[in-house]
């Protein structure tokens, strides 16, 4: 059986933490930033974890993570 391929787009977007969760960036910090408050932009800069409902999908996309 051949090796499973990693989805390269997902590999660039998600990182596995030591506890086995997946880290991701928050959306909304690329453009149209003038109407967003400094507090909101600061919070958007922090990383978030992948929700439990989506962990299975991420694991399938990253078989070797």
UniProtKB/Swiss-Prot annotation:
<dbReference type="InterPro" id="IPR018265">
    <property type="entry name" value="Ribosomal_bL35_CS"/>
</dbReference>
<dbReference type="InterPro" id="IPR001706">
    <property type="entry name" value="Ribosomal_bL35"/>
</dbReference>
<protein>
    <recommendedName>
        <fullName>Large ribosomal subunit protein bL35</fullName>
    </recommendedName>
</protein>
<comment type="similarity">
    <text>Belongs to the bacterial ribosomal protein bL35 family.</text>
</comment>
<feature type="region of interest" description="Disordered">
    <location>
        <begin position="1"/>
        <end position="49"/>
    </location>
</feature>
<keyword id="KW-0687">Ribonucleoprotein</keyword>
<feature type="compositionally biased region" description="Basic residues">
    <location>
        <begin position="1"/>
        <end position="43"/>
    </location>
</feature>
<dbReference type="InterPro" id="IPR021137">
    <property type="entry name" value="Ribosomal_bL35-like"/>
</dbReference>
<dbReference type="Pfam" id="PF01632">
    <property type="entry name" value="Ribosomal_L35p"/>
</dbReference>
<dbReference type="InterPro" id="IPR037229">
    <property type="entry name" value="Ribosomal_bL35_sf"/>
</dbReference>
<dbReference type="GO" id="GO:0003735">
    <property type="term" value="F:structural constituent of ribosome"/>
</dbReference>
<keyword id="KW-0689">Ribosomal protein</keyword>
<dbReference type="GO" id="GO:0006412">
    <property type="term" value="P:translation"/>
</dbReference>
<dbReference type="GO" id="GO:0022625">
    <property type="term" value="C:cytosolic large ribosomal subunit"/>
</dbReference>
């Amino acid at each position: 059986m051949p090796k499973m391929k990693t989805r390269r787009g997902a590999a660039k977007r998600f990182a596995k933490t030591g506890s086995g969760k997946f880290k991701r960036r928050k959306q909304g910090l690329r453009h149209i930033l003038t109407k967003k408050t400094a507090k909101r932009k600061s919070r958007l800069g922090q990383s978030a974890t992948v929700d439990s409902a989506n962990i299975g999908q991420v694991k399938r996309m990253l078989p070797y993570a």
